[in-house]
């Protein structure tokens, strides 16, 4: 509040821009006053309950809660408990303001460490068990955050995830290992409760203690699919690409669901600008922009595919189709951002984002130090496999004509199972260390990235491209007909950046490079099987630059060929 008031006092309004800044700072002050009032009301309620409470232990707790709520957020927290209360208030304020998903807790073990160290280690005001109980109470509160979603949203983001990510481990801004006693305690709290929120994320690099990785792996072995492991080196590279310093890159955290972003509250996040369905793009190319489900012209007219002379002409048409639809997505997104900028600025989120108070602009106005928006894709592997199938079966070996292929797809391979098996089995498949089809995938991804990263949104921020589907691959697959990779009409597309389950042919080490990991473990063993720990902590994991968060499923009671195979990709569960 003091900073905003100083800015108001030091600014002379000489025009519209100055007045907008003054209005923004005044709004921040009003917001702060409202947040303090909210906390004081909580204190009054706790005192009211304490007055009628006959349980002395509970009464003491209620009075402590009241005291905490009269300290934070008006003043800085002094204890580990007050720090928890401060973080929770901030989380609730975000939810009140924007009712948002993907509002994570950041590098919890870093900003909470001074309070833990003071209370538990230095002054011994509380025991480690009491600190653990506070963490567990905090985690239970996180489970109370919930969104009621419509049918499409519930299908596309199945399981009603809120993506309240809590990050531990990694590096300090000066490049030292950041793991501390609280890092382990955060995992232990999650291990004991086994709740869906918060989602635990372990940052790993060559300096990460094996004990921390082992603890996370042990949790996975017990069947939690939690925590996820994130590779520092790949994430730092992505973060540096957004223009931040090396210190900010080392301090990276998860912005949104899985996207790495600069730490320290310097980014406005990576909101979901929209998804493009690669299966549908192929359908549009094969039907010259017409949606075969509706008969309407929905895409770009790229010509009759029967006239294409080679695979390069097909890929050129597909690239034009993809860019056309990403431009439609970003046009709609910019319109929405412009409306939000004028009608619905998020004041609290702006207050706690570096650059906004200093510049006098909300995050929608481009006030954040770093600004990005996420563009997403579904069916990436299906696209690569479809291109490879057309190249091999239509243009090279001439097993079928383009007209025959289109007719078979339009009829969902009815009476054409032989053709479908040909498309499924003859061409190379992405993600199996086959250079040609992997090259197709890489070519298409690089093309999209090189294009969209040149674009700016309404806030002046840049777009980041993510192969990241959640379960949108299910809803997108449901509205797409059969595809040239042999997929049937209505079937889900591949999950995120990984390949289709039945096309995983060439082993764990190949799968590491996709990026995602496939590991073999036996969840019935009392001791952790080494392959699980070795893959997560191995040099190979770091050397291939696996950015995709590594989540591991250890199913119980179901054995496949004497082993339990499970794919490791956070949103593929």
Question: Residue ranges of each PLM-predicted region?
Answer:
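A basic, often C-terminal nucleic-acid-binding module that engages the phosphate backbone, implemented
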Residues: 47
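Extended non-globular scaffold/tether segments
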Residues: 26-40
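Conserved catalytic cores of very large enzyme subunits
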Residues: 1-27, 61-573
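A conserved hydrophobic secondary-structure block that centers on an alpha-helix together
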Residues: 50-60
């Amino acid at each position: 509040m003091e900073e905003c008031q100083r800015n108001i006092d030091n600014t002379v309004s000489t025009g519209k821009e100055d007045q907008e800044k003054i209005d923004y700072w005044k709004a921040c002050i009003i917001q702060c006053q409202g947040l303090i009032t909210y906390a004081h009301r909580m204190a009054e309620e706790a005192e009211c309950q304490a007055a009628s409470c006959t349980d002395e232990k509970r009464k003491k707790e209620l009075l402590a809660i009241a005291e905490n709520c009269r300290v934070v957020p008006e003043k800085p927290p002094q204890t580990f408990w007050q720090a928890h209360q401060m973080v929770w208030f901030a989380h609730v304020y975000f939810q009140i303001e924007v009712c948002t998903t993907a509002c994570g807790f950041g590098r919890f073990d870093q900003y909470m460490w001074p309070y833990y160290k003071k209370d538990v280690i230095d002054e011994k005001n509380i025991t480690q068990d009491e600190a653990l109980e506070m963490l567990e109470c905090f985690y239970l509160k996180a489970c109370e955050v919930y969104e009621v979603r419509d049918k499409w949203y519930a299908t596309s983001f199945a399981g009603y995830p809120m993506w309240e990510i809590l990050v531990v481990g990694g590096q300090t801004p000066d490049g030292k290992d950041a793991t501390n006693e609280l890092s382990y305690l955060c995992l232990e709290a999650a291990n004991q409760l086994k709740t869906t929120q918060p989602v635990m994320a372990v940052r790993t690099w060559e300096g990460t203690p094996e004990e921390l990785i082992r603890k996370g792996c042990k949790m996975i072995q017990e069947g939690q699919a939690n925590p996820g492991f994130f590779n520092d080196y790949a994430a730092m590279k992505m973060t540096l690409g957004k223009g931040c310093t090396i210190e900010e890159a080392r301090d990276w955290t998860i912005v949104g669901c899985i996207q790495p972003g600069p730490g320290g509250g310097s980014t406005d996040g990576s909101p979901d600008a929209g998804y493009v369905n690669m299966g549908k793009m192929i359908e549009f190319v094969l039907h010259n922009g017409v949606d075969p489900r509706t008969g309407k012209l929905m895409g770009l007219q790229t010509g009759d595919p029967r006239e294409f002379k080679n695979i390069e002409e097909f890929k050129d048409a597909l690239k034009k189709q993809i860019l056309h639809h990403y431009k439609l997505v970003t046009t709609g997104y910019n319109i929405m951002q412009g409306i939000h900028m004028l009608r619905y600025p998020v004041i609290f989120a702006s207050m706690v984002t570096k650059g906004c108070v200093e510049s006098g602009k909300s995050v929608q106005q481009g006030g954040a130090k770093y600004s990005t928006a996420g563009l997403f894709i579904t069916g990436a592997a299906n696209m690569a496999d479809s291109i490879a199938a057309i190249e091999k079966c239509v243009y090279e070996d001439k097993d079928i004509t383009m007209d025959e292929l289109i007719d078979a797809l339009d009829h969902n391979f009815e009476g054409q199972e032989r053709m479908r098996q040909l498309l499924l089995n003859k061409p190379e498949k992405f993600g199996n260390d086959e250079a040609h089809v992997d090259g197709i995938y890489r070519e298409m991804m690089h093309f999209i990235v090189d294009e969209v990263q040149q674009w700016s949104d309404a806030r002046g921020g840049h777009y980041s491209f993510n192969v990241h589907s959640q379960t949108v691959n299910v809803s997108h697959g449901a509205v797409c007909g059969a595809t040239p990779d042999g997929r049937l009409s209505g079937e889900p597309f591949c999950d995120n950046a990984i390949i289709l389950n039945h096309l995983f042919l060439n082993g764990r080490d190949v799968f590491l490079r996709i990026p995602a990991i496939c590991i073999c473990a036996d969840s019935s063993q009392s001791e952790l099987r080494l392959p699980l720990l070795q893959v997560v902590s191995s040099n190979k994991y770091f050397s291939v630059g696996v950015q995709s968060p590594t989540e591991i499923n250890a199913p119980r009671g179901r054995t496949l060929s004497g082993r339990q195979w499970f794919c490791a990709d956070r949103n593929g569960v």
